[in-house]
Amino acid sequence: MTLQFSWVASANSAETDFPLNNLPYGVFSTDGLEPRCGVAIGDMILDCRAAEEAGLIDLGADPIFDVPFWNEVMEAGHDTWTTLRARLTEILAKGSKDEVIAKDMLVPRAHVDLHMPFLVAEYTDFFASRQHAQNMGAILRGAASLPANWLNIPIGYNGRSSSIVVSGTGIHRPNGQTKAPDAEMPSFGPSKRLDIELEMGAIVGKGSDLGQPITVDQADEMIFGYVLLNDWSAR
C-alpha cells in the first residue's frame, strides 16, 4: 500500500500506527472536553464533533457527532461510512485547504482518556480459527482434532456485552464453584486460572430487519469496522 501523506507531520513517520491510510475511530475526553467522537491521525486525534460544528463534516440535515458514541454513524449505513472516510482523508491530506481550520481541532493522544467507541448491543464469540480449534482439541481430547461440526456450521458463543470494556480497565477475577480432584463437594471462590486470547472483532454496523437473513454477498456492506479484543476466560 502506498503511504498517503498528511499535513499532520507525525502521521508520515515510518513508526506511526496511524498514517492517513489508517484512520481508526474512537471516543475520547480531556480535562476540558467531555467524551466525544474522534479519529486518530499520527500522535493526534481529530475532534469530529468540533469538525462537524465548524461545517468541515456534513453527513446530513441533523448532527451525527453530537453524541459520545459511533452508533448513529453505524446506523446510517455503508454509503455514509464511505462518504465520511473520504471526507476525513480529504481534510487531513497534505495540501488540504481545510488545514487552517482543522489544525485547531487536533488533540494530542497523550493527553486524552479513551472510552468505549460505541454501545455494544450484542457480543458473539466465534470459534473461527482452525489452528486454535485443533489446539483446543489436543488440550481437551488429547489429539489435535476438529470438532465434528467445525467444517460445516459456525460455532459461536453468546457473550455478555456488558463485560466489554476499553483497554486499560482493570479485570475482576471471577468467582465460581470448582471441585478439587480429592474433594467430595465443590467450593466457591475466585478462579485460580485465567487465560487470554487475542481476537479480532467484526463490528456489525447497520442491522437487518427481523427475520431477514444477511447473505454472504451483503456481509461487506454490513461490517462497520474491526477491533482487537483481549478475550479473558476463567478456567
What positions do the PLM features span?
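Active-site microenvironments in enzyme catalytic cores
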Residues: Q4-T30, A40, L46-R235
